[in-house]
Amino acid sequence: MSLSQFIFIDMKNILKYKDYREYMQDVYNERKRTSVFSWREFSALAGFTSPIYMKLVCEGKSSLSKTKMGRVAQSLGLEGYEREYFEQM
């Protein structure tokens, strides 16, 4: 499962972002705005066991390795140039 099945109407295009943390936070905020969503669910979608791992990343208290970056990109449903851009941020 990934977040790609959800339509994010108020999201900026990923190319407008310079920081993956800001993009992840906006995805979380938009998903939370339109339904019940939690950091636990966001972390689980990316395959992390810590329920607050994604929150820690967005707050700058933890970083994503290249491997983890790929897992997050997949959970966000990013493909092609969007995935490449995300992984280079």
Where are these regions (language model features)?
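Recognition helix of helix-turn-helix/homeodomain-like DNA-binding domains
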Residues: A44-L64, A73
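Residue-level signal for the short linker/turn that defines the boundary of a DNA-recognition helix
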Residues: V36-S38, T49, T67
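Residues within the helices of the helix-turn-helix
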Residues: R40-E41, G70
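Hydrophobic micro-packing sites on short alpha-helices
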Residues: K68-L76
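DNA major-groove recognition helix of helix-turn-helix
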Residues: Y28, V57-C58, K68
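Short, basic alpha-helical nucleic acid-contact segments in DNA-binding proteins
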Residues: L64-S65, E79
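A short, Lys/Arg-rich alpha-helix, primarily the initiator
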Residues: S2-R40
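Short amphipathic recognition helices of helix-turn-helix/homeodomain-type DNA-binding modules
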Residues: N13-I14, L76, G80-M89
